[in-house]
């Protein structure tokens, strides 16, 4: 969600001798997009995951916005990444000087229980399935727009295009809370 959602394409194209573009990434199951088996994708990912996740580019304005948000909010990163990527994830956040109150590397896409334990008010997500699951548990979700998450939304999900829009929505929510 803080990184470019298509960061993996160049590596996958090189490895599988393909020519996939970001426009073709219309679903979250990457092996289907590439036209390979899940096992083939898993083998590829396991070979390069540390390199891939250490070099993924950060989204425009994400660092600055998170730094501003941390002044009035707790910032938790809840990621579905595998546990073996926990140290790398901390290093990545520190490299970009991204402040946080906690990092939760779940090794699973199911984030609801952790979000409940942390009493999250807003969840920023790019996975459609995660957004739906979180929203059904009454979390407000800001779904960062990607080619692979453009499906119908419910009342607890707001589609956002960038980190400035995320900031504006959260700031508006904070002002409404203060007014009450």
Model-derived features with residue positions:
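Active-site neighborhood of HAD-like aspartate-dependent phosphohydrolases
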Residues: 1-43
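Short glycine/proline- and acidic residue-enriched helix-loop micro-motifs
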Residues: 43-51
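Short, acidic loop-to-helix structural element flanking the phosphoryl-transfer center
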Residues: 50-77, 82-90
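Substrate-recognition "cap/lid" segment bordering the active-site pocket of phosphatases
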Residues: 80-133, 137
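Short acidic-hydrophobic, aromatic-tinged amphipathic segments that line or gate anion-handling sites
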Residues: 103-107, 158-165
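Short, charged, surface-exposed secondary-structure boundary motifs
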Residues: 112-115, 151-158, 169-171
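Acidic, Mg2+-coordinating phosphoryl-transfer loop and its flanking beta/alpha structural elements
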Residues: 120-161
